[in-house]
Amino acid sequence: MKRALISVSDKNGIVPFAEKLVELGVEIISTGGTKAAFEQAGVPVTGIEEVTEFPEMLDGRVKTLHPAIHGGLLARRDTAEHMEAIAAHDIKPIDLVVVNLYPFQETIQKSGVTLEEAIENIDIGGPSMLRSAAKNYAAVTVVVDTADYDTVLTELEEHGATTFETRQRLAAKVFRHTAAYDALIAEYLTNITGETFPEKVTLTYNRKQVLRYGENPHQDAAFYTEPGTVENSISSAKQLHGKELSYNNIRDADAALKIASEFTEPVAVAVKHMNPCGVGVGENIEEAYLKAYEADETSIFGGIVALNKEVDAKTAEHMSKIFLEIIIAPSFSEEAFAILAKKKNIRLLTVPFAGSVKGFEKTSVNGGLLIQASDSVIEDTASYEVVTEKQPTEAEMKALIAQWKIVKHVKSNAIVVGSDKQTLGIGAGQMNRIGSALIALKQAGEKAKGAVLASDAFFPMDDTVEAAAKAGITAIIQPGGSIKDKESIEMANKYGISMVLTHVRHFKH
C-alpha cells in the first residue's frame, strides 16, 4: 500500500490512524478541514489540488471530482491497458480511501434547519470516491466507518496489505452506507414535495441490536431503527436496567406505548401478546396502575406495562409485588428506580412521550410492503351521533370515549368493556364479533353492570347488542355502517341502552 486518500467530517481517531499509515510508508492525500487537521498535528500530507493540479471551486463543491482521483481509484491493477492509460496521464494508483460523509442526517434533525442548509450538507464528492473505491475492491481498501480503522492497521502491520476478504466486506459496507445516505436525502426531499406514495420507496434503518432469537427460538432476528429520534417509540427507548430486550418484548412494548400515547391523563397499560389485558386511568399514576392491575390480575403477570407519567415510589412498590417483563415510562423517581432495580430480570425503560403516534406504518407481506397512514385520525366527538332513544349520560360518554381510544389497539374483531377509569373485559381476535363480545362480557362478569362497550367496527347482527344489554351494559360506541344498523339500534332501544356512532372504523389486523 503506497497511497491513501483521506477526507472525513468525523475526525475522531483520524490523526493517530494517519500517523500509523505514515510510519508504514503510506503517502497521505487529503482535502480541506482534514488536511488542516493533519498539518496541525504534524502529519505529512499532500493537498488534493497538488494531485489534480486544479483548485477547489464553487465553495468547495468541486474538489475531488477529477480523473486524477477517480482514475487512480478505478484502474484495474491486473489490466495492462488500465495501468498504461493512467501512466500516460501521470495518474498514480490510490490504494486506500478513508471517507465519511457530510452530516446530512444530523443537519436535518436540527431545529429550524433551512432547505439551503440541508442541500449544502448533501455530499457529492465523498460518495463518488467511496463508490469508485468500493467498485475496485479487488485492489483498493475503502473505509467509511471509524470502527474499521484498527482492522485495517492490524492487517497492514501483519501482512503489508489488507486481505481480499476484508476489502470485500468493507466494500459491501460502503454500498450499504451510500445507499442509506441517498435514501435519507430522497425521503427528505420527497417529504418537502408532499408526495405521500412515490413510485419508488427506499427505506433505511440502522441495526440497533442482534436479538437472541425472533418470535420463536428457531428464528434468527435483529432490531433495526429509523434514523433519528422517534418520540413515543420503542426505537428511542433508553434502557436503565435489566437484560436485553427480546423480539417479543419489543413488539409488546410498541403496542403498549401506542395505547399509552392516546391519553393525556395518567394512564397505565398492561400488554400481553400485543393486546392490552388491562388499561387504567387515574388522578395520579399510582391509581392508574392499580386500575390496570385490577382489570385483569391474572394476565398482567409476565406482561409489559407502559405508563405516560413518571413512576413514583408508591407505584413502584405495587409493581414490585408481581413479575413484569418490562416497565416503560417517561422517567422513574430515584426511589422508584431503587425499588424496581432490586429485581434483576425486570427491564426498565424510559421513552419520550409526545401525544398519539402519527406518521406511516409499514407491514411486510411475502414479496411486498404495505404502507399506510397510522390510525391516528383526530376525531371530533361533536360529530358523534347518538342514534337511540336514550341519551348517554355525561359519565357514560366519558367512559365511551376512553374505551374507544383503547379498542382501536385491540386485534380485530375487537370488543372492550369498561368504565371511564379502566377496562373490565377485552375480547380480541375472534373471527366473529359476537365471539369477541362474549369473551369481553364474560371477563367483566358482574362488573359489566353499568359499564359501557366499545366495538372497533360495526355490528353485522344485533346479537352483540342483545348480549351486552343482558349483561348489564348501559351504553355502546361503535362506527356504524352496517346494512343492519337499524336492527342493532332497535335492539338497543328495546333494552333501554344508548348507542353512539362515530362513523370511524378502527380495524386492526
UniProtKB/Swiss-Prot annotation:
<dbReference type="InterPro" id="IPR036914">
    <property type="entry name" value="MGS-like_dom_sf"/>
</dbReference>
<dbReference type="InterPro" id="IPR002695">
    <property type="entry name" value="PurH-like"/>
</dbReference>
<keyword id="KW-0808">Transferase</keyword>
<dbReference type="InterPro" id="IPR011607">
    <property type="entry name" value="MGS-like_dom"/>
</dbReference>
<dbReference type="Pfam" id="PF02142">
    <property type="entry name" value="MGS"/>
</dbReference>
<protein>
    <recommendedName>
        <fullName>Bifunctional purine biosynthesis protein PurH</fullName>
        <ecNumber>2.1.2.3</ecNumber>
        <ecNumber>3.5.4.10</ecNumber>
    </recommendedName>
</protein>
<comment type="pathway">
    <text>Purine metabolism; IMP biosynthesis via de novo pathway; IMP from 5-formamido-1-(5-phospho-D-ribosyl)imidazole-4-carboxamide: step 1/1.</text>
</comment>
<keyword id="KW-0511">Multifunctional enzyme</keyword>
<keyword id="KW-0658">Purine biosynthesis</keyword>
<dbReference type="InterPro" id="IPR024051">
    <property type="entry name" value="AICAR_Tfase_dup_dom_sf"/>
</dbReference>
<dbReference type="InterPro" id="IPR016193">
    <property type="entry name" value="Cytidine_deaminase-like"/>
</dbReference>
<dbReference type="GO" id="GO:0005829">
    <property type="term" value="C:cytosol"/>
</dbReference>
<comment type="pathway">
    <text>Purine metabolism; IMP biosynthesis via de novo pathway; 5-formamido-1-(5-phospho-D-ribosyl)imidazole-4-carboxamide from 5-amino-1-(5-phospho-D-ribosyl)imidazole-4-carboxamide (10-formyl THF route): step 1/1.</text>
</comment>
<keyword id="KW-0378">Hydrolase</keyword>
<dbReference type="GO" id="GO:0004643">
    <property type="term" value="F:phosphoribosylaminoimidazolecarboxamide formyltransferase activity"/>
</dbReference>
<comment type="similarity">
    <text>Belongs to the PurH family.</text>
</comment>
<dbReference type="Pfam" id="PF01808">
    <property type="entry name" value="AICARFT_IMPCHas"/>
</dbReference>
<feature type="domain" description="MGS-like">
    <location>
        <begin position="1"/>
        <end position="144"/>
    </location>
</feature>
<dbReference type="GO" id="GO:0003937">
    <property type="term" value="F:IMP cyclohydrolase activity"/>
</dbReference>
<dbReference type="GO" id="GO:0006189">
    <property type="term" value="P:'de novo' IMP biosynthetic process"/>
</dbReference>
